Amino acid sequence: MYAIVRTGGKQYQVACGDQLRVEKLEGNVGDSLDLTDVLMLVDGDNVQVGQPVLENAKVVAKIAEQGRGKKIIIFKKKRRKGYRLKQGHRQSYTALKIEEISA
């Protein structure tokens, strides 16, 4: 059994026991949260597709980690003008462990 869920403006395919990184969600490590934006649910030959989401379907996940990704460097330069701008960015993320999928 697996499901397609939407969180943080992106869609993820999840199954029980999976661990994935999503955009930062509020909560502490160990907290449980429900992902209710379930777009599709597949259980063997039984396929349910929402329009756009499935009613009464949810995915229960546990927050495994709150962290920040690797630093990326943004560097801008104008030739011959002496203009240089260096900027760094680290995106915050939440690591989730999928515990249960229910319909």
Swiss-Prot record:
Disulfide bonds: none annotated. InterPro entries: bL21-like (IPR028909), bL21-like_sf (IPR036164), Ribosomal_bL21 (IPR001787), Ribosomal_bL21_CS (IPR018258). Keywords: Ribonucleoprotein, Ribosomal protein, RNA-binding, rRNA-binding. The keyword rRNA-binding applies. One of its GO terms (molecular function) is rRNA binding. GO terms for cellular component: cytoplasm; ribonucleoprotein complex; ribosome. PANTHER family: 50S RIBOSOMAL PROTEIN L21 (PTHR21349), LARGE RIBOSOMAL SUBUNIT PROTEIN BL21M (PTHR21349:SF0). Belongs to the bacterial ribosomal protein bL21 family. HAMAP family: Ribosomal_bL21. This is Large ribosomal subunit protein bL21. The lineage of its organism: Bacteria, Pseudomonadati, Thermodesulfobacteriota, Desulfobulbia, Desulfobulbales. The gene is rplU.
